[in-house]
C-alpha cells in the first residue's frame, strides 16, 4: 500500500514540539523540533569542542544530556573543558560515557529517565566502533523523541 501524500494544510496541522531555545541560541537556531538529528562539522582546532560543550550546557536546561566521548575520552583535555565551562553547574543533567558499543547505548536509552539529548563525539570514532549507517539510523528511529547530535571533523 502506498504511503499517504500530505497536502500543505495537512502538514500545517501536524503538532510538532519545538525546543525552547532562548537568547543567543534562539537567535542563531530558532526553535528546532524535538527529536531532530544534528550534525556539527568543522575543521580540527576550530573551536568545535568548546562550542559543543557550551551547547550541551544550554541543553541541560531543557533536559538531560548524554555525551558519548569516543574521540577524547575523559582525560585532561575533557577535564579542562568541563572546568572552563563550569559543567559542574549542570552536574545532575550531564553525563559522559566512553563506551562505543551502540547496543549498550540502545539499552541505556531504553531505560526510564534516560537522556533527552545524545551528543556523539565523534562521528568518525563511532563509525570505527561499528556504528554502521543502518544501525545508527535504526537507533535514531527507535528513539524519535530524543535529539541526536553528531560531531565530526572535516
Regions flagged by a language model, labelled:
Residues 1-15:
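Charged, amphipathic alpha-helical linker segments immediately N-terminal to NTP-binding catalytic cores
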Residues 33-42, 50-54, 99-154:
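P-loop NTPase motor core
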Amino acid at each position: 500500500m502506498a504511503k499517504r501524500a500530505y497536502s500543505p494544510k495537512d502538514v500545517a496541522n501536524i503538532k510538532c514540539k519545538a525546543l525552547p531555545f532562548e537568547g543567543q541560541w534562539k537567535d542563531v537556531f530558532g526553535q528546532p523540533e524535538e527529536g531532530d538529528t544534528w550534525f556539527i562539522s568543522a575543521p580540527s582546532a576550530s573551536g568545535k569542542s568548546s562550542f559543543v560543550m557550551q551547547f550541551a550546557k544550554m541543553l541541560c536546561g531543557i533536559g538531560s544530556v548524554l555525551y558519548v566521548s569516543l574521540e577524547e575520552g575523559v582525560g585532561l583535555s575533557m577535564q579542562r573543558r568541563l572546568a572552563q565551562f563550569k559543567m559542574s553547574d549542570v552536574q545532575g543533567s550531564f553525563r559522559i560515557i566512553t563506551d562505543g558499543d551502540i547496543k549498550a547505548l540502545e539499552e541505556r536509552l531504553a531505560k526510564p529517565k534516560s537522556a533527552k539529548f545524545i551528543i556523539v563525539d565523534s562521528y568518525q570514532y563511532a563509525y570505527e566502533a561499528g556504528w554502521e549507517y543502518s544501525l545508527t539510523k535504526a537507533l535514531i528511529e527507535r528513539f524519535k523523541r530524543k535529539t541526536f547530535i553528531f560531531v565530526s571533523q572535516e
